[in-house]
Amino acid sequence: MNATFRCFAARKQLKHALLAASILLAAWYSLPPAFAQAYPTKPIRVIVNSAPGGLTDVIGRLVAIRMGQSLGQQLVIDNRTGVGGLLGAEQLTKAEPDGYTIGVVASAITVTPQMMAKPSFDAARDFTPVSLLMSTPLMLVTGLNSPYRSVADYVAAAKASPGKITFASGGTGTMTHLLAEQLQLQAGLKLIHVPYKGGAPALNDVLAGHVPVYFDTLTTSAKLVQENKLRGLAIVSPNRSPALPAVPTLAEAGYPGVQGMAWFAIIAPANTPREIVAKLNEEANKALSTPEIKERILALGGTVEGGSAAVLGDLIRSEMPRWAKLIRDANITIQ
C-alpha cells in the first residue's frame, strides 16, 4: 500500500469515526432532560399555600413524606400563606420548571384569581397539572344552641328577615363562601357574608353561636357532629355520608343545584418536562395507594383521588368557567 493510499484510508477512517461520534452525541442531547440524568438528584421544594396544620398542609405532608422515601430525596415543605392562599401559587409560577419546585394547592386556585381585577395567574395556563390527591364534600353546619334544625328553618328565617341573617366563610372566594352564595341565589335570599381568615376561626364562632351557619369540610366537621358538639344540616354531595347517615344531602333538602367540593392536588410550574411530570404523578399515585395514607384520608372524611395528570388538568379547566359564572352572578370581588 503506497503512502497516498494509506493517507486516504486514514482520512476515511477518521471521517467515519467523527461521524459515529457526532451521531452518538446528537442522540445523547436529544434525550429528554429527565433521562439525561437521574431525577431527582437533590431535594424537592414543595410550596404549600396554607398554614401548617391546615388541610392542604396535612395532605401535602402525608404524600410528600412517602414520595420522598420512594424517590430517595427529601420533599421539603415550604408553607406560603397570605392573599387568600394566592401567595404560594404566585411564587410557584416564578419557579424554574425543572421538577425541583412543585406545589400542593386547594381548589381555590381555580376561583380566587377570577375575582380580582388583575389576576396574578391563570390556573389552567400557568401551571402543569401533576396529580389530584383527595377531595372532600362540605356540610352546612350550625351550633347546638342554634334555632335551626334544618336547611328549611334557616331559609325561612332568612326570608323573614332579609339582609339580617348571616353566614360565615373561611374567606372570600373559598368553597365555604361559594356554596353559601349558590344557596343564597337559588333560595332567593339576601344574606350577610361574614368572611374569616381561615376555616378554624369561622368554625369557632359558629360553635360559640356568634354566627349561625357555615359550610365546613366534612374532614373537619364530621367528628364534631358525631360527638354532638355541632349540628349538621345538610351535606353537599350526591349521597349521604356513611359517617353521618342521619344528615340529609342538600339536594334532599330541596337545593340540588348547590354543588361543589374541596379538592387538593400537586401542580408544577408551566412547561415542566412531561417525563418529570410522569415521574411525579407515578410517585404520587404510589403514595396514595399505601394503606396508611388511604386510612388517614378516609379518617379525615375525604376520598382518595389520584389518577393521571390529565384528569387534574380536565378538572381545573372545567371548574374555572363554572365558578366564573357564579362570581359574575353573585357579584363577588376581592381586592
Model-derived features with residue positions:
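N-terminal (or domain-start) structured segment
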Residues: 35-125, 164-166, 172, 188-213, ...
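C-terminal lobe and pocket-closing loops
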Residues: 135, 221-289, 318-321
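Hinge/capping helix and adjacent helix->loop/strand transition within the periplasmic-binding protein
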Residues: 94-100, 114-201, 250, 263-296
